Amino acid sequence: MAKKLYIETHGCQMNEYDSSRMVDLLGEHQALEVTARAEDADVILLNTCSIRERAQDRVYSQLGRWRELKLANPDMVIAVGGCVASQEGAAIRDRAPYVDVVFGPQTLHRLPEMIDAARISKLPQVDVSFPEIEKFDHLPEPRIDGPSAYVSVMEGCSKYCTFCVVPYTRGEEVSRPFDDVIAEIIHLAENGVREVTLLGQNVNGYRGLTHDGRLADLAELIRVVAAVDGIDRIRYTTSHPLEFSDSLIQAHAEVPELVKHLHLPVQSGSDRILAAMKRNHTALEYKSKLRKLRAAVPGICISSDFIVGFPGETEKDFEQTMKLIADVGFDFSYSFVYSQRPGTPAADLADDTPEELKKERLNALQHRLNQQGFEISRQMVGSVQRILVTDYSKKDPGELQGRTENNRIVNFRCDNPTLIGQFADVHIDAAQPHSLRGSLIQ
């Protein structure tokens, strides 16, 4: 009987991508098959996130729940990867001594041998080092799971924002070779993928070495990806405003496969807070780049990230953030209350905003963003949108769902499952808080 793998993923799209590659790797090297039940597993993997305090707490809560499974089945291997593993290393075993393997984002390619070593030696295996992009040389071809796919083009970040753990948990920026990225995307396209999302912690800082020794930027990569037969849509995330270049704006204007949506995290609308965060740009500089983009691509939708309650944030600082939200017209954001992350420069600052006030500000910010996003959705009612049909609707098996160019989910009634993986024209009938309803145009 085949051995079983249970995997749980916390955090960002990069973690989702890494988890999919772990499944590929362990399927090829150890013939492990994925199970939906941890109690049935021979190997349990937890791919962790350390961006937020609660995400880190979740790790130890989850490991605590698996302790009984390990006691019942001592041969079970429990492995912890991702950014919490990178940050804490062997110290994870101080709180969860039944963990067998601890590995970082850059050493996931060593997972099969680490699992084997743990089984044979009965000793814990820990490797949270930062070998430069080596993991991609050891991974099998990616498994295809639907018409959309993530492709990691770079790892790490060298910006060292004062609130962020990424440079310490994933290392500094390292770009994958240009031809390696294109080869992976060709493989995906040959197997039915129609949309790719290019991933990196600072993806628009991509500088990939080409076969002739040049460094290609993200704009050049996008143009070549768009020329791959079968690829009809391109997205990328996550970007830093400093790296949002004129060449990228030109690519948005000239490459029809590049969607009319940009996720460009700003974190705050206050220049004082932006300086304290070491973002190295002002709110005006951020808005100026978006004005150029919108002049080149009218109608493009912009989403962002915000941190509320950063140390020293005053009411005036928060009002400036709310003004930026209104000025730009963001339609969505990943927004969080600030929490101290150990080892970051901001952790040395006084976290002096009361938690209740942080929550009030976060609620006000999210309410404003929800209003703006719904208004954009409402304006789409009556239009015809070309959507990539990705799956059955999560709420009604008699419906299919897909995404618009500007990243909105559309649900529509359809009894033809062969549309999944294809593009379809859908008339938008109604706007809902977090999705659209439509009718298939036959």
UniProtKB/Swiss-Prot annotation:
PROSITE patterns: MTTASE_N, MTTASE_RADICAL, RADICAL_SAM, TRAM. Binds 2 [4Fe-4S] clusters. One cluster is coordinated with 3 cysteines and an exchangeable S-adenosyl-L-methionine. GO terms for molecular function: 4 iron, 4 sulfur cluster binding; metal ion binding; N6-isopentenyladenosine methylthiotransferase activity. [4Fe-4S] cluster 1 binds at residues 12, 49, 83. [4Fe-4S] cluster 2 binds at residues 157, 161, 164. Its cofactor is [4Fe-4S] cluster. It catalyses: N(6)-dimethylallyladenosine(37) in tRNA + (sulfur carrier)-SH + AH2 + 2 S-adenosyl-L-methionine = 2-methylsulfanyl-N(6)-dimethylallyladenosine(37) in tRNA + (sulfur carrier)-H + 5'-deoxyadenosine + L-methionine + A + S-adenosyl-L-homocysteine + 2 H(+). Monomer. This is tRNA-2-methylthio-N(6)-dimethylallyladenosine synthase. It comes from Pseudomonas fluorescens (strain Pf0-1). The lineage of its organism: Bacteria, Pseudomonadati, Pseudomonadota, Gammaproteobacteria, Pseudomonadales. The gene is miaB.
